[in-house]
Amino acid sequence: MSLSHLYRDGEGHMDDDEDERENFEITDWDLQNEFNPNRQRHWQTKEEATYGVWAERDSDEERPSFGGKRARDYSAPVNFISAGLKKGAAEEAELEDSDDEEKPVKQDEFPKDFGPKKLKTGGNFKPSQKGFAGGTKSFMDFGSWERHTKGIGQKLLQKMGYVPGRGLGKNAQGIINPIEAKQRKGKGAVGAYGSERTTQSLQDFPVVDSEEEAEEEFQKELSQWRKDPSGSKKKPKYSYKTVEELKAKGRISKKLSAPQKEISQVKVIDMTGREQKVYYSYSQISHKHNVPDDGLPLQSQLPQPGKEAKAPGFALPELEHNLQLLIELTEQEIIQNDRQLQYERDMVVNLSHELEKMAEVLEHEERVISNLSKVLEMVEECERRLQPGCSNPLTLDECARIFETLQDKYYEEYRMSDRVDLAVAIVYPLMKDYFKEWDPLKDCTYGTEIISKWKSLLENDQLLSHGGQDLSADAFHRLIWEVWMPFVRNIVTQWQPRNCDPMVDFLDSWVHIIPVWILDNILDQLVFPKLQKEVENWNPLTDTVPIHSWIHPWLPLMQARLEPLYSPIRSKLASALQKWHPSDSSAKLILQPWKDVFTPGSWEAFMVKNIVPKLGMCLGELVINPHQQHMDAFYWVIDWEGMISVSSLVGLLEKHFFPKWLQVLCSWLSNSPNYEEITKWYLGWKSMFSDQVLAHPSVKDKFNEALDIMNRAVSSNVGAYMQPGARENIAYLTHTERRKDFQYEAMQERREAENMAQRGIGVAASSVPMNFKDLIETKAEEHNIVFMPVIGKRHEGKQLYTFGRIVIYIDRGVVFVQGEKTWVPTSLQSLIDMAK
């Protein structure tokens, strides 16, 4: 930007007071030389800074100043400007002084309506200033060097898919012709000479921009206020805003006639003008006149030097404000009326819906009144037919049909009515007459169907029920208690407890019909006292009817209610067993039905106190004689195996049987016996015990002890003569018996593991062992023991495994451990203990 002109005023002279001021206004010279790289700059010298305007410059007469201004030529003729009002744009352009046009145009000196008018240019503009100072070559030959090349750019584009004559892009959406440029006529700003759109732009984008439309509309409306230069009186065209457009726009002016209370009380200080003004609502700001402030004119409104001030031709701000206010008030009134109309229409729709609802309510109420009238007629008809002298008395079946009709057709009214009082007045007399001659023990199912029907008609549902024994809330419960219960109470007082079957059958037939609290009342208040009294009178030594025959049938109905009877029963049975001998099997027949009735603890205590001592005495009297054995006493004891626990039975055998049995075996072996007979005798006694008893560790130890005694006998060479093959037979017997024991143990362990897996205890169902090897593997994982096969090692065709530090093999569900000389079978638990 040029700096030399910054030291001169608008006429090109220096100001004494402002010689040190730098003016940064943009001049025409700056605009013309904006892109001129060769423009000359003048830098202020030290002499110019010291002497200011009195400094001598050699180049004052040689080159023009950068400000584009020349000194006035006083030898030129004087041009006079005629006074008067503002003329047309063309005349004003001719009368303007050429010197004024050469002055730099300041930003604040542009006319207010600058835009569509042309820039005023004079004839004194230097032709040399139409181009840059340094000058540049024309662009006509730009790119002419390419004509001597081989067109590599065009070839590259064609390789990438470009087709000549079509646009760029994947879908050829680019423009074909280059963008055309339109040269502006003068030196004004953009838009100063009208539209600058080219022919290509009009073809590609025929739609007119909204800003251009607004400008055209503004010029059209503005021209209506101007006088036609031709003098013809043409009727002006006005554009109107219809009511529909105003409604569609829905604009609500902020200038409300009745502002909100909290907004109207806001204090607003307006400091936009020369003076501070205070308003007490926002609406007052919008109501103020748009009148220019009376003060010094703006810099843009000051007359230019050498020109007269031009007064505005037509300015009535008060009238314009009033007209605008009337327009806005009218728009507000239209919008408010439209809203009020919409509100009234919505109110009409709402009232129509309310009318429909009220009509439905009225119809419902009329229907309810009609139904209540019909229900009342039916009830009155029932009361009339219940009178003593009626020719057509009401029966229970007809009454049930009437109640069914009430429940089916008039369900809401039936639910809302007082069914208790209705049933008491109508149903109860008929029900009493129906059960008048009923005997429950002879015909236990009499009346079950009719009572079941009345249960569905009279019993309250869960929402209306007030409790199990609230007779005032449930008509059916009251019916059973007041009509049915007296007949049952009367028959129970005459009933004999030893004849329990009719009473049990009667209650089983009615247990699903009568209420639960009534059944509890019958069992607790009527049946149990009778049973308790009968148990006190029972004598097990004299009564021929077993007590369980008339007590146990009550178990499904009474269950834990019979617990108080068990203690006196056990006491009476214990007293009866004081002189009992195991040879009498009647005791077992009397006690066996009570095994599952008494609790396990009480049953075991009863057996240990009253039965086990008798069995011990009987077993102590047993004489073991291999040549002539009497087994009656042994059978009497073994017959109680299911009645007493296994531990109690094993205790009896350890104390009273095995000592004598082992003593007889030792005596037999010391007298040169026949080992085949001993083997048969051993196996015969072992077959007398069940698998459950043989699996007990104490019993196994005793039989293993007998095998050890026999092995020592055949190995000690006692006597001069030894039966041939006796040693081998005893060894084979020992091996076979131990093998059976371990097979049984393995089977038991496998069953326990399967049961645990089925119950969900322990391992998951997917990991349940399918064979004995899987079971051993599972146990090894549980105890963190290494279990793996020994590669290339077998014994009798069986794979050898290492279980920790022990070598084992599995044969038909039995684990064999490698001993010092032979393979010894062992149990799984023993194997785990040895591995640890």
UniProtKB/Swiss-Prot annotation:
Pfam family, one: GCFC
Compositional bias segments (type: Acidic residues): 14-28, 91-102
GO molecular function: nucleic acid binding
Region (Required for nuclear speckle localization): 709-733
Annotated region (Disordered), positions in chain: 1-31, 54-73, 85-136, 183-236
Domain of life the protein comes from: Eukaryota
CC terms in the record's Gene Ontology section: catalytic step 2 spliceosome; chromosome, telomeric region; cytoplasm; extracellular matrix; nuclear speck; nucleolus; spliceosomal complex; U2-type post-mRNA release spliceosomal complex
Span(s) of short sequence motif Nuclear localization signal: 699-704
Domain G-patch: 149-195
InterPro entries associated with the record: G_patch_dom (IPR000467), GCFC_dom (IPR022783), STIP/TFIP11_N (IPR022159), TFP11 (IPR024933), TFP11/STIP/Ntr1 (IPR045211)
Chain positions with Phosphoserine modification: S2, S59, S98, S144, S210
Region (Required for interaction with DHX15), start-end ranges: 1-50
GO biological process: biomineral tissue development; negative regulation of protein-containing complex assembly; spliceosomal complex disassembly
Signal peptide: none
Family membership: Belongs to the TFP11/STIP family.
Biological role stated in the UniProt entry: Involved in pre-mRNA splicing, specifically in spliceosome disassembly during late-stage splicing events. Intron turnover seems to proceed through reactions in two lariat-intron associated complexes termed Intron Large (IL) and Intron Small (IS). In cooperation with DHX15 seems to mediate the transition of the U2, U5 and U6 snRNP-containing IL complex to the snRNP-free IS complex leading to efficient debranching and turnover of excised introns. May play a role in the differentiation of ameloblasts and odontoblasts or in the forming of the enamel extracellular matrix.
Assembly notes: Identified in the spliceosome C complex. Found in the Intron Large (IL) complex, a post-mRNA release spliceosomal complex containing the excised intron, U2, U5 and U6 snRNPs, and splicing factors. Interacts with TUFT1. Interacts with DHX15; indicative for a recruitment of DHX15 to the IL complex. Interacts with GCFC2.
Classification via PANTHER family: TUFTELIN-INTERACTING PROTEIN 11 (PTHR23329:SF1), TUFTELIN-INTERACTING PROTEIN 11-RELATED (PTHR23329)
Protein name: Tuftelin-interacting protein 11
